[in-house]
Amino acid sequence: MDQVFAAIDIGSNSTNLLIVDQSGKTLERVVRSTRLGANIAKTGALSAEAIQRTLDCLREYEVLVKRHNVSHRRTVATAACRVAKNTSQFFTEAKKISGTEPELISGETEGALSFV
C-alpha cells in the first residue's frame, strides 16, 4: 500500500496544507488566510476569533487528510504560537480535531523547513 504524507504549517498569517504520495507527487496543496497572529503584538495572546478561524481551517484540512488516507502527518506551529500566552489552549483544541497536538518549532527550524 502506498504511503501518503501530510504537512500542516500553522503560521501567523496563513495555515498551509500539503499532501504528497511516496514519490513526492503533490496530491493536495491548500493555503488559507487564518491570521492567527492578528493583534498578538497588542494583547500577547491569540484572539478567540483568530483561534476559531484556524480551528475551522484545521477541520477542513482534516477532511482532506482522511480523503487521501494519509499515513503520516506533521503539524507545526510557528511564530505566533511561540510568543502567545495562550498557545496551550489553542493546541488543546487543535488536538481534538486531528488527534495530534501541533509541534511548536523554533524560528531556526522554521527557516530551515521553508527551503524544503
Residue ranges and their predicted role:
Residues 1-10, 18-116:
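Nucleotide/phosphate-binding catalytic cleft detector across ATP-hydrolyzing
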